Amino acid sequence: MNTAITATTPTEYSYNDRYINRELSILDFHLRVLEQAVDPLHPLLERMNFLLIFSRNLDEFFEIRVAGVMEQFALGNESRSPDGLTPRQVLQKISETAHTAIERQYRILNEEILPKLREEDICFLRRGELTPAQSAWVKKYFQEQVAPVLTPISLDPAHPFPRLVNKSLNFIVTLEGKDAFGRQIDLAVVPAPRSLPRVVRLPDELTGGKEHHVMLSAIIHEHVSDLFPGMTATGCYQFRVTRNADLALNEDVEDLAKALKGELSSRRFGRAVRLEVTQNCPQHIYEYLLEEFDLNEEQLYKVDGPVNLARLVSNFKRPHLRYDSHTPVVPKVFKKTESIFSAMQKQDILLHHPFESFAPVIQLLREAARDPQVLAIKQTLYRSGADSEIVQVLAEAARNGKEVTAVIELRARFDEESNIEVANVLQEAGAVVVYGIVGYKTHAKMIMVVRRENNKLVRYVHLGTGNYHAMNARIYTDYGLMTTDKDLCEDVHRIFQELTGMGKMAKLKKLLHAPFTLHAQLINFIDEEIANAKAGRKAQIIVKVNALTEVQLINKLYEASQAGVQVDLIIRSICCLRPGLPNLSENIRVRSIVGRFLEHTRVYYFSNNGDARIYCSSADWMDRNLFNRVEACFPIEDPALKKRIYQQGLLNYLQDNQQAWLLQGDGTWIRAKPAEGEKLHNAQRELLETFK
């Protein structure tokens, strides 16, 4: 536990007193996710799912964030981050926290989740629990379904240690005896192909109708000797290596897509950053593996169970162990008219996903693709998937002769391969595909449809805080604005011109856009609140984003706090600001909401002396969003929509006392609890009730 931080003046706070380390802050978010696995607010199978989400999150954390810090350390970089820590110090703190977290993860799995699943007749059987009939079935399954695709690799001078794929399941086997060539083989490695299911369900006739499962790792472990005829397997131990998965791409290449394809293949074999082994792995074995992967014991993680929990997934048909089903509602405005275009002409339309349906966005594109009066469709795509309905509708529009322009961000992390496929699908259909601006990721969420009406060209625009991904729109909270506002439409048109053509920075009327005007305008908005507070007027700032790391904005918020501005921050993940510090940030409160849906909306609120400014945006308050990406930040001007966002999207979350976590000045997070007599308030449940 960190000690309390205090000073009599702002200047007395050192750097490490003013800021929280970014890497440690994101690790804290993953810990908040892990805590959902023991939260009785969630049904049992959803708690298990949070356990798996934690595994996936931690995998990416090591692949990207830890790998980056390790590179800095390897290069001898001793420069300190804003919080005052060197790369070496950061790695030490990550290791301490991650080891404790992973131990807790497996303790939750073994002591809470699995026993409770067993009470529901969902069992993950260990080898010693199988009946003779079940053992016979498993042996046959191994012989027919598993062994034919396994490739055991002996380790000797003729067979050096193999290159193993990032995050793949592997076994190291200790052997006695000689092989067919008379060689004395002591060790072998058996990689488990990703094509094999990690969980195998036993037939109902062998389980009395109960759901009994066996791990692939247990099946291989039990029958690994069959892979080495005439030899004896004296030990078999799971292990998994996590590698650096960040892409080092020279963006000055002539063909970005081609260069990306080459980098994607190398991602599978990047530098090792973590080794996971089972708890019973002998010291001489894991030391051998550490040497092969050039890792130290600080990077070794011993686990009490499968080394790849992220793939511990099975389709359990137990509705009572899941969340109640939720069907997103379609706003009434769309039910009163046959055409999306007619609805948008009447008013600005705000969509709040996943409580409201994503279908109107797809319907806008579908109508545009088939309407003979539509001339052009332009859209940005960051994450969508080649088989998504949106991509298929855009391809249909191109085939129907519409001028379709897609700005596809090929460098969206872990979606690069999918986005290359999206580009190919659209190009083959006849769409114009561009990859944005070299050096800047295109992260803005924009659609523009151009339609001929009464001999004039009319534009219809959708702006969003989240990706054009129908599946994510069912589990991520996001806002989308559908509008025909002429100024907003003209601004979107100009940003598309920036992305597809050449020329100077576009001068926009209403939109704020990164990397040009957004950061400076945010500073101006905060300065206005500071001036209002100093003049004795009401001053308040509410920001809801995924992350806050940008130092200038943090310092400006500190300045606002010292001036008396009330600052409320709803930060899902990373927050480098320290709230509640005397004479620095005592007027700043920070909370994080972790629940059924992943909080993804970006909303900025400035009270503006009673004439509130509310913006929705694709941008978090991070350096990369504000300076290295193309982002769109759009104002909400309709009074009814402003009221909706303020009440449902901000105040509702500030009142949450069930899913909220509160950041302390020492960098720790504590669970919000209702005060004595205070009514329980769950923000996401309130919205589910509101939009029934």
From Swiss-Prot:
The keyword Magnesium applies. GO terms for molecular function: ATP binding; metal ion binding; polyphosphate kinase activity. The gene is ppk. The lineage of its organism: Bacteria, Pseudomonadati, Pseudomonadota, Gammaproteobacteria, Moraxellales. It catalyses: [phosphate](n) + ATP = [phosphate](n+1) + ADP. Catalyzes the reversible transfer of the terminal phosphate of ATP to form a long-chain polyphosphate (polyP). The active site is at residue 443. SUPFAM superfamilies: Phospholipase D/nuclease, PHP14-like, PPK N-terminal domain-like. Mg(2+) binds at residues 383, 413. This is Polyphosphate kinase. Its EC number is 2.7.4.1. Its cofactor is Mg(2+). Belongs to the polyphosphate kinase 1 (PPK1) family. It holds the Pfam family PP_kinase_N. One of its GO terms (biological process) is polyphosphate biosynthetic process. GO terms for cellular component: polyphosphate kinase complex.
